[in-house]
Amino acid sequence: MNKSIAPATSVVAGNVKFGNALPLSVIAGPCQLESRAHALEVASALKEIATRLGIGLVYKTSFDKANRTSAASARGLGLDAALPIFAEIRDHLGLPVLTDVHENEQCARAAEAVDILQIPAFLCRQTDLLLAAAATGRIVNVKKGQFLAPWDMGNVVSKITHAGNAKVLVTERGVSFGYNTLVSDMRALPIMAKTTGAPVIFDATHSVQQPGGKGTSSGGEREYVPVLARAAVAVGVAGVFIETHPDPDHAPSDGPNMVPLREFEALIKTLMEFDALAKKRSTVGAV
């Protein structure tokens, strides 16, 4: 282990650069990998939007939703089916790809086809999983647990950097506030930036989730996604994480949180305007 390494202040996935003082980048896509056709449809649409707006975009989706509320809930296609789809999106569409991993042995295999490995919020303190992800050399995006203080992410990031990987992102996705409720404390964004030294991402869609709020599945209040996204970008962040879907109300998971694809471009355009204003008046590394 290398105990002297510090997290990079900016990281590059494909042609997308993340840095707290750099122009805003986006991580976007559907919650769950539903099929090859669906993934390519959404990825192609997102690439067109990103090209029109001139913003860096990483495509995200999950091959396995391993922490669903109910055992009967759809979980995804699985890693074996997902790998060639991830590779096709990355290699033929030219979009960097992010997916989450839940077990140590998934890390090396997923890293063959994606640019960013994501550690789910519930697993953010699992040392062996963090080390396995770090060992791949890929960028590691760690979701801050709903139970964790923002300053505690310094210890999480140090596990990755001590393994010799400086390419880390940290993501705020809300904090538990009573039962089935999350709130967003915007102070967490500059605190995490200062504590970790890593680029900070704001997850605007999971922050409006109501965990387990529908009994056998999670609810959500997607109407507040633009509100929280604007607030976070006004504070100043490296990127926003926004799940989007052509028909969220019929999505197999997290539909109540996801932004309809038809509304995505207008939202990102607004966020870019907020970002330009926030970073124009900010000093370098202010967040």
Curated annotation (Swiss-Prot):
Signal peptide: none annotated. GO terms for cellular component: cytoplasm. It is found in: Cytoplasm. Transmembrane segments: none annotated. SUPFAM superfamilies: Aldolase. The gene is kdsA. It catalyses: D-arabinose 5-phosphate + phosphoenolpyruvate + H2O = 3-deoxy-alpha-D-manno-2-octulosonate-8-phosphate + phosphate. GO terms for molecular function: 3-deoxy-8-phosphooctulonate synthase activity. It comes from the Bacteria. This is 2-dehydro-3-deoxyphosphooctonate aldolase. GO terms for biological process: keto-3-deoxy-D-manno-octulosonic acid biosynthetic process. Its EC number is 2.5.1.55. Belongs to the KdsA family. Keywords: Cytoplasm, Lipopolysaccharide biosynthesis, Transferase. Pathway: Carbohydrate biosynthesis; 3-deoxy-D-manno-octulosonate biosynthesis; 3-deoxy-D-manno-octulosonate from D-ribulose 5-phosphate: step 2/3; Bacterial outer membrane biogenesis; lipopolysaccharide biosynthesis. It comes from Rhodopseudomonas palustris (strain TIE-1). It is an enzyme of class 2 (transferase). The keyword Transferase applies. HAMAP family: KDO8P_synth.
